[in-house]
Regions:
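N-terminal short beta-loop-beta anion/metal-coordinating cradle
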Residues: 1-43
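Internal, conserved structured core segments that host functional sites
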Residues: 34, 47-99
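Secondary-structure boundary elements
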Residues: 58-69, 129-134, 162-166
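A generic local secondary-structure boundary/capping motif
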Residues: 26-28, 58-59, 124-126
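Surface-exposed cleft-lining segments at the edges of enzyme active sites
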Residues: 43-50, 111
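Catalytic cores of processing enzymes, dominated by hydrolases/peptidases
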Residues: 78-158, 198
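Short beta-strand segments
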Residues: 39-40, 71-73, 139-141
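Extended, histidine- and acidic-residue-enriched regions that form the cofactor-binding/catalytic faces
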Residues: 134-200
């Protein structure tokens, strides 16, 4: 259920139309039964606004007595991921408190030992401790510029493990992943054949 929107004159002015209904591009949905809220942004947010948006999310979470925030951050792979290797899609994570890290361990999610996290997830991690809110950031491997539905499916499954009751249409995501992988393979094959023809 849509319960709120985040608006700013600094955002790109965009209206997202779904089933003939216009929506603000940055929205908050909530499920009262599951005590779960989801922030959705369908615009790219300027880096200069990360701090403002991150703190807006944290303040909203505090005002609504949320005790856990789950965010995600991309880990870009320069080379294509081997879809046949499940380890390629393993997700690592970081928690801002001992309680958050124990929650990850209980869900058998690997902890990031060393590294950096940027953007809004970094603001959530750095600013949340003073508010007493647990934050978990899931790190997902992607290939830059290519929609990766397998990674999305893995992310959705991981969130479902952390928040029982939250679900997503995983089979549909995997079906889309398979379709896109076949298209990419076909394009690469055609490109290789064209290169061979060029050399006679």
């Amino acid at each position: 259920q849509l319960i709120a929107t985040i608006e700013s004159s600094y955002f790109s002015q965009l209206s997202v139309v779904r089933n003939s209904i216009p929506y603000f591009p940055v929205r908050i949905y909530a499920n009262e039964e599951l005590k779960t809220a989801i922030f959705i942004s369908e615009i790219s947010i300027e880096p200069s606004l990360y701090y403002l948006v991150g703190n807006t999310m944290l303040n909203w979470a505090k005002d609504n007595e949320c005790d856990l925030i789950i965010s995600s951050s991309n880990s870009v792979n320069p080379q294509p991921i081997d879809a046949s290797n499940p380890n390629e899609y393993s997700i690592a994570a970081i928690g801002n408190t001992v309680r958050a890290r124990n929650r990850l361990k209980d869900s058998k999610i690997a902890l990031l030992n060393n590294g950096t996290i940027g953007g809004i997830p970094a603001v959530l991690l750095n600013q949340s401790s003073v508010l007493g809110i647990d934050v978990i950031v899931l790190l997902v491997k992607i290939i830059e510029g290519i929609p990766d539905f397998r990674a999305a499916a893995e992310l959705s499954t991981t969130i479902s493990n952390l928040v029982p009751g939250v679900s997503c249409n995983i089979p549909l995501l995997l079906q889309e992943a398979e379709r896109i992988e076949k298209e990419i393979t076909k394009i690469k094959t055609q490109g290789t054949e064209s290169e061979m023809d060029a050399y006679g």
